């Protein structure tokens, strides 16, 4: 029988993600819109980060390169977007992360961001993975909606073979026919058995691809139930998108948590994690 490797904790600035560490929470708006909005959300996340049982990273995209429609808004672009992320980092003290879509974006993003993210649709793109890992930054790679959790071993191998910044794998749902995603919670322990901390993306898991015609729909009321299941089964980190007024977000509004509900949602999840940790004590 092949021995299961120990999970290798991932260091993100002063944070550590892995077994026995405070819950890592990656959160923010889906896409960067303005400096004012980014700082508003970042300041609320920094307030939450004062808790001792959580480690918060600010996340937002500078380009939504896989939008459903050509007419959909994509974001401010890499130059302006990285400037906004730098402002959030400087004003809140939070680590920041964003996703990259092309290998040539990796170096510039690695200069600003503390963690690089690989979108699920691009999880098997070798050149992108190699470029991300080569920055020396830790990488959070989302499991493709079309992939089995066991097949993520090859993705992890590509990243580990190209850099030593650390790897996290993220569960964000699996295609279930057309326009629907489901979560197989077995994915969390299976991917942890690859020796990496596992993130659960609670808001993208409730997406309904193409559910609004030229845009993606979603069901935010299912975000917390799924996040509770992920915490109960032992995820190392949670991922959420949040916005003061989700209906005005250019992307993913239907599955985002309203900012004024985020702290309460997280508090309940942290109390659940404390109870789960007690079972292992």
Swiss-Prot record:
A single GO BP term for this record reads:
keto-3-deoxy-D-manno-octulosonic acid biosynthetic process
The GO cellular component terms are: cytosol
Q: Which UniProt keywords apply?
A: Cytoplasm, Lipopolysaccharide biosynthesis, Transferase
One Pfam match, given by its short name, reads DAHP_synth_1
SUPFAM superfamilies, per database record: Aldolase
Q: Does Transmembrane helix count among this protein's keywords?
A: no
What InterPro entries is this protein classified in?
Aldolase_TIM, DAHP1/KDSA, KDO8P_synthase
Q: Top EC class per UniProt?
A: transferase
Tell where it localizes.
Cytoplasm
Q: What is its main location?
A: cytoplasm
HAMAP family to which the protein is assigned, alphabetical: KDO8P_synth (MF_00056)
Give the family this protein belongs to, as stated in its UniProt record.
Belongs to the KdsA family.
Write down the PANTHER family for this protein, in alphabetical order.
Answer: PHOSPHO-2-DEHYDRO-3-DEOXYHEPTONATE ALDOLASE
Name of the protein:
2-dehydro-3-deoxyphosphooctonate aldolase
């Amino acid at each position: 029988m092949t021995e299961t490797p120990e999970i290798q904790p991932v260091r993100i600035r002063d944070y550590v993600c892995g077994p026995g560490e405070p819950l890592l929470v990656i959160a923010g708006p889906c896409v960067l819109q303005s400096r004012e909005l980014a700082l508003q959300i970042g300041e609320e996340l920094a307030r939450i980060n004062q808790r001792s049982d959580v480690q918060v990273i600010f996340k937002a995209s500078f380009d939504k390169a896989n939008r459903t429609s050509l007419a959909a808004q994509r974001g401010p672009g890499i130059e302006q977007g990285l400037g906004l992320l730098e402002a959030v980092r400087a004003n809140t003290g939070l680590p920041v992360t964003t996703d990259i879509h092309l290998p040539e974006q990796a170096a510039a993003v690695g200069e600003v961001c503390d963690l690089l993210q690989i979108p699920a649709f691009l999880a098997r793109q070798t050149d992108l993975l190699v470029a991300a890992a080569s920055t020396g930054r830790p990488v959070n790679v989302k499991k493709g909606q079309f992939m089995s959790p066991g097949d993520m071993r090859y993705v992890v191998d590509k990243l580990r073979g190209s850099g030593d910044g650390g790897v996290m794998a993220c569960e964000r749902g699996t295609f279930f026919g057309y326009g629907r995603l489901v979560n197989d919670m077995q994915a969390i322990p299976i991917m942890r058995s690859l020796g990496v901390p596992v993130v659960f993306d609670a808001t993208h898991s409730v997406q309904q691809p193409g559910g609004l015609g030229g845009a993606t729909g979603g069901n935010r009321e299912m975000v917390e139930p799924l996040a509770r299941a992920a915490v109960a089964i032992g995820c190392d980190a949670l991922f959420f998108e949040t916005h003061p007024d989700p209906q005005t977000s250019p992307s993913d509004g239907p599955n985002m948590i309203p900012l004024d509900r985020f702290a309460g949602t997280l508090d309940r999840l942290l109390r659940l994690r404390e109870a789960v940790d007690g079972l292992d004590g």
